[in-house]
């Protein structure tokens, strides 16, 4: 399975009865790098504002103390505050690991359990395995590409199984969809 959907290995015959996939959340390297860059930028703008106000260079590069506090220093301060607020939001989402969870398919109990971590609580959906009608693969290329694996469930909207973010490679998406459809003994739609 991919890094997005990772099968948890089970011992013996239990692997034929149960499939568990972990789903990667917000705690990805790309999000952490973005949070670091935004934090450094926000601190830089804030220190530039303070340097302009105090008349002393607080940054090792440039000479921000020569900037006039009104209007350049104030604008730098606003950019710095906005950057630090955005950075704190990103770090909070990384700490929460928003969107992380698991997909559990249990033939023995006949249940499917989908769990995801939300902003303030764990979001969970349970339904009978017999209600799953198909595994759906959605592919859309272009400016905003979409590669999604979802379950078609009777009486519900399609339930997405893959993470939001960078699209999976097409071959991996097809392989994951085929393995899941084979395990659930349902059709694979969308290809």
From Swiss-Prot:
Q: Name one Pfam family in it.
A: Ycf4
Q: Which gene encodes it?
A: ycf4
Q: What are the UniProt keywords, alphabetically? A: Membrane, Photosynthesis, Thylakoid, Transmembrane, Transmembrane helix
What the entry lists under NCBIfam families is as follows: PRK02542.1 (NF002712)
Instruction: Share an example GO biological-process annotation for this protein.
Output: photosynthesis
Specify the domain of life of the species encoding this protein: Bacteria
* Protein role: Seems to be required for the assembly of the photosystem I complex.
* Name of the protein in its database record: Photosystem I assembly protein Ycf4
């Amino acid at each position: 399975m991919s890094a997005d959907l990772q099968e948890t290995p089970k011992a013996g015959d239990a692997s034929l009865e149960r499939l568990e996939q972990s789903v990667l959340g917000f705690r990805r390297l790309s999000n952490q790098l973005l949070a670091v860059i935004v934090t450094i930028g926000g601190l830089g703008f804030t220190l530039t504002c303070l340097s302009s106000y105090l008349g002393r260079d607080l940054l090792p590069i440039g000479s921000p103390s020569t900037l006039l506090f009104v209007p350049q220093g104030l604008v730098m301060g606003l950019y710095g505050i906005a950057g630090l607020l955005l950075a704190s939001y990103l770090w909070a989402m990384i700490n929460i690991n928003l969107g992380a969870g698991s997909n559990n398919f249990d033939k023995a109990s006949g249940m499917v359990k989908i769990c995801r971590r939300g902003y303030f609580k764990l979001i969970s959906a349970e339904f009978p395995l017999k209600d799953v009608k198909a595994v759906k693969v959605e592919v859309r290329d272009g400016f905003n590409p979409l590669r999604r694996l979802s379950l078609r469930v009777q009486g519900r909207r399609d339930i997405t199984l893959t993470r939001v973010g960078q699209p999976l490679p097409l071959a991996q998406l097809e392989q994951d969809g085929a393995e899941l459809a084979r395990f659930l003994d349902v059709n694979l739609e969308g290809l």
